[in-house]
Every structure is written in structure tokens, then in C-alpha cells.
């Protein structure tokens, strides 16, 4: 009686544990499904940022190739930069939430899902930093091109300025420093100064944008650098696992081929034996009738 009751209690406990495991598996599956939806959303946002960076490059070229001040293109450029800034801040915030969740879950036992989340987070972070690095380079390149444009226009206006002096004039933030000592009695001279002031204004906007994104950029870059070794190790293991699987598949195919050949040999031997035995029986019967 006592043994039966103990068995019943153990069976009930086992059922409860199975129910808990099933509930946990279902919860993990749903969590990972939501996680991958978030990953795809972030990846899509980063792709949009990358596309907008390409549009920024086109706007830069259009502005610099236009001899007159193109206000419409500049407004479109300002809007693109604002869109990139908003999207980048959102992506950074979402990546930060994932990072915090991973750090929290690392306090417990590690599992395959946690490793997957780490890898996905690191891959997204790397991609994001690559795109933002390209954007930062685009801005600094445009600054140098604007600076070169100012230098050429100053030369046209007859004002010789060295590179260091020009840099100081730009950093002063005062467009009036460019007009000192320049006679603006012709339309061409006025147009030249207007272009200089426009390029200087562009540089001021660029530097403001670069400063705004600098902290975010450095934060993400440091995160990616710290994750680099882990990701490289994971990629190495995955690559070697793939090679192992490929070799295993090839070996399996060879084994199947050898097995198939061996099977065919056995069948041929069996058929030959049957034919010989049948012929022998027919010969014996025929010989018996003759006798």
C-alpha cells in the first residue's frame, strides 16, 4: 500500500515536471520568435539608414557641382540628416535593450538561445557601426570638399590663405572673417563671397551633426570591439562545424555507394548461384529420365 502511494506521488511529480518543461519550452520558443522579429526590424532600420547615407552622398555632390546656392537641395539634405539621426538613435536604443537583457540572463546558466542572441546582437551591432562609420566618413569628406571650395573661392577673390589659417577661420564660426580685405564691388565678387559663406555654413552644420553622433558612435564602436573576439571565435567554430558536416556528408555518400556496390555484388552472386543450382537440378532430372 505504501509502495503504491509512493509510486503515485512520483508519477504525479514526473507529470508536473513534464508540464513545467513543456511550458518552459513553449515560453522560450515564443520569446525567441519575438526576438527574431525584433532582429529583423533592427536590420531593416539599419538598411534604411545605409540607403539614406547613399542619398546624402548624392546631395553632397549635387550641392558642390552647382555654381549657385541650391536651397532646395540643402533642405533635402538637412531632412535626410535628421532622419538618419532619429533612426540611428532608435537602433542604438533597441540594441542597448537587447544588450541589457543578455547581461541579465548571463547571471543564470548559459544556453543555446543565449548564444544565438549574443551572436545576433553582435552581428547587428557590427553592421550598424559599419553604416555609421560610412556616414561619418561621408560627412568628413564633404567637410574637406567644402573647405577646398572655400580655398578656391578665396584664391579667386585674391585673398591668399594658408591651410592652418583657413582652418582657424572655419573654426571661428564667424563668416565675416572671410570678407575682410575683399572688395565686393562686382557681381562676381558678391557671388564668390556668398558661396564661401554657404560652404562655411555647411561645415558648421556638419560639425554639429558629427558631435551629436560622436558619443553614440564611440559607444557602439567600443561594444563591437569588445565583442569582436567572441564573434570571431563563434564564426570559427561554425565554419569548422560546417566543414565537419560537409566531410560527414561526403563520407556518408561514399559509404552508401560502397554499400550499394556490395549489395549488387551479393545479388549477382546469389542470382548466379540460383541459376547454377537450377541448371544442375534440370540436368539431374533429365539424366534420370534417360536412365
Swiss-Prot record:
Spans through the membrane: 267-287
Region: Disordered, residue numbers: 1-24
Membrane side Extracellular: residue ranges: 288-291
Result when mutating residue 248 to V: In e246; causes constitutive dauer formation, defects in locomotion and increases life span. Restores pharyngeal pumping in animals overexpressing lin-3
Domain of life according to the entry: Eukaryota
Keyword Transmembrane helix assigned: yes
Membrane topology, Cytoplasmic segments: 1-266
Coiled-coil ranges per UniProt: 69-95
Gene disruption phenotype: Worms exhibit defects in locomotion and postembryonic development. All mutants are resistant to the acetylcholinesterase inhibitor aldicarb indicating impaired cholinergic transmission.
Disulfide bonds: none
Record keywords, A-Z: Cell membrane, Cell projection, Coiled coil, Cuticle, Developmental protein, Differentiation, Membrane, Neurogenesis, Neurotransmitter transport, Transmembrane, Transmembrane helix, Transport
Residue ranges occupied by any t-SNARE coiled-coil homology domain in the UniProt entry: 193-255
Tissue: Expressed throughout the head ganglion, nerve ring, ventral cord, dorsal cord, intestine, vulva and spermatheca.
Keyword Transcription regulation attached: no
CDD domains per the UniProt record, alphabetical: SNARE_syntaxin1, SynN
Membrane topology: Single-pass type IV membrane protein
GO MF terms, alphabetically ordered: protein-folding chaperone binding; SNAP receptor activity; SNARE binding; structural constituent of cuticle
Function text: Plays a critical role in several secretory processes, including cuticle secretion and neurotransmitter release, and probably assists in neuronal membrane maturation or the final stages of neuronal differentiation. Plays a role in synaptic vesicle docking and tethering through its association with unc-18. Through binding to unc-18 mediates the release of the neurotransmitter acetylcholine from cholinergic motor neurons, and thereby promotes locomotory behaviors. Essential for embryonic viability and development. Has a role in dauer formation and adult life span. Required for locomotion.
Assembly, per entry: Interacts (via N-terminus, in open or in closed conformation) with unc-18; the interaction is direct. Interaction in open conformation with unc-18 promotes synaptic vesicle docking and tethering. Interaction via N-terminus with unc-18 mediates the secretion of the neurotransmitter acetylcholine from cholinergic motor neurons. Interaction with unc-18 is reduced in the presence of unc-13.
Protein known as: Syntaxin-1A homolog
Source species: Caenorhabditis elegans
Gene: unc-64
Amino acid at each position: 500500500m505504501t509502495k503504491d502511494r509512493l509510486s503515485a506521488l512520483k508519477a504525479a511529480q514526473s507529470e508536473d515536471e513534464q508540464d513545467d518543461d513543456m511550458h518552459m519550452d513553449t515560453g522560450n520558443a515564443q520569446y525567441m520568435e519575438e526576438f527574431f522579429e525584433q532582429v529583423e526590424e533592427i536590420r531593416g532600420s539599419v538598411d534604411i539608414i545605409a540607403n539614406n547615407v547613399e542619398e546624402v552622398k548624392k546631395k553632397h555632390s549635387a550641392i558642390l557641382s552647382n555654381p549657385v546656392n541650391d536651397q532646395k537641395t540643402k533642405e533635402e539634405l538637412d531632412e535626410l540628416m535628421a532622419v538618419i539621426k532619429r533612426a540611428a538613435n532608435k537602433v542604438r536604443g533597441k540594441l542597448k535593450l537587447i544588450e541589457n537583457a543578455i547581461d541579465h540572463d548571463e547571471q543564470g546558466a548559459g544556453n543555446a538561445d543565449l548564444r544565438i542572441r549574443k551572436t545576433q546582437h553582435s552581428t547587428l551591432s557590427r553592421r550598424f557601426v559599419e553604416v555609421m562609420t560610412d556616414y561619418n566618413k561621408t560627412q568628413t569628406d564633404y567637410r574637406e570638399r567644402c573647405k577646398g571650395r572655400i580655398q578656391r573661392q578665396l584664391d579667386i577673390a585674391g585673398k591668399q590663405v594658408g591651410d592652418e589659417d583657413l582652418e582657424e577661420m572655419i573654426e571661428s564660426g564667424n563668416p565675416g572673417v572671410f570678407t575682410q580685405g575683399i572688395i565686393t564691388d562686382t557681381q562676381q565678387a558678391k557671388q564668390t563671397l556668398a558661396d564661401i559663406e554657404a560652404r562655411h555654413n555647411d561645415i558648421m552644420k556638419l560639425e554639429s551633426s558629427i558631435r551629436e553622433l560622436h558619443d553614440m558612435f564611440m559607444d557602439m564602436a567600443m561594444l563591437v570591439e569588445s565583442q569582436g573576439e567572441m564573434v570571431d571565435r563563434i564564426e570559427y567554430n561554425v565554419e569548422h562545424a560546417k566543414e565537419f558536416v560537409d566531410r560527414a556528408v561526403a563520407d556518408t555518400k561514399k559509404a552508401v555507394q560502397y554499400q550499394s556496390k556490395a549489395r549488387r555484388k551479393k545479388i549477382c552472386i546469389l542470382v548466379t548461384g540460383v541459376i547454377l543450382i537450377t541448371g544442375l537440378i534440370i540436368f539431374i532430372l533429365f539424366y534420370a529420365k534417360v536412365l
